[in-house]
UniProtKB/Swiss-Prot annotation:
It comes from the Eukaryota. GO terms for biological process: cytoplasmic translation; modification-dependent protein catabolic process; protein ubiquitination; ribosomal large subunit assembly; ribosomal large subunit export from nucleus; ribosome biogenesis. It holds the Pfam family ubiquitin. Keywords: Cytoplasm, Isopeptide bond, Nucleus, Ribonucleoprotein, Ribosomal protein, Ubl conjugation. Gene3D superfamilies: 4.10.1060.50, Phosphatidylinositol 3-kinase Catalytic Subunit, Chain A, domain 1. Residues 1-76 form the Ubiquitin-like domain. This is Ubiquitin-ribosomal protein eL40A fusion protein. In the N-terminal section; belongs to the ubiquitin family. In the C-terminal section; belongs to the eukaryotic ribosomal protein eL40 family. InterPro entries: Ribosomal_eL40_dom, Ribosomal_eL40_sf, Ubiquitin-like_dom, Ubiquitin-like_domsf, Ubiquitin_CS, Ubiquitin_dom, Ubiquitin_ubiquitin-like. Changing K29R: Deficiency in ubiquitin-protein conjugate formation. Ubiquitin is encoded by several different genes. UBI1 and UBI2 genes code for a single copy of ubiquitin fused to the ribosomal proteins eL40A and eL40B, respectively. UBI3 is a polyprotein with one copy of ubiquitin fused to ribosomal protein eS31. UBI4 is a polyprotein containing 5 exact head to tail repeats of ubiquitin. The 60S ribosomal protein L40 is present with 40000 molecules/cell in log phase SD medium. CDD domains: Ubl_ubiquitin. GO terms for molecular function: protein tag activity; structural constituent of ribosome; ubiquitin protein ligase binding.
Length: 128
């Protein structure tokens, strides 16, 4: 039977499959056509993410059904230099004791009118 796979770019891929094919098998066919590794593919049908070990018939996918292909988000760690820069940017601030406005580290008075431009500032607490 024939099914369609629609990518986020709007491109539609046509695949020739059997209802007994597994989702793994379908992902392999997508890799053959598009070059996207199966571990980066997520297939969605009727609002559900399809699990690798299950078959097309498990999800009631019939001829000329359309699956949606979404790529997996890649995570990772932040470089130590970027982490230091981010913590410096976020932590080297002063905070108004009355209105909790974040201010530059060298500020002497609050910039907000609601606390009357008070001079009661404290350093922002450091993240642990």
């Amino acid at each position: 039977m024939q099914i369609f796979v629609k990518t986020l770019t709007g491109k539609t891929i046509t695949l020739e499959v059997e209802s007994s094919d597994t989702i793994d098998n379908v992902k392999s066919k997508i890799q053959d056509k598009e070059g996207i590794p199966p571990d980066q593919q997520r297939l969605i049908f009727a609002g559900k993410q399809l699990e690798d070990g299950r078959t097309l018939s498990d999800y009631n996918i019939q001829k000329e059904s359309t699956l949606h292909l979404v790529l997996r988000l890649r995570g990772g760690i932040i470089e130590p230099s970027l982490k230091a820069l981010a913590s410096k940017y976020n932590c080297d601030k002063s905070v108004c004791r009355k209105c909790y406005a974040r201010l530059p580290p060298r500020a002497t008075n609050c910039r907000k009118r609601k606390c009357g431009h008070t001079n009661q500032l404290r350093p922002k607490k450091k993240l642990k």
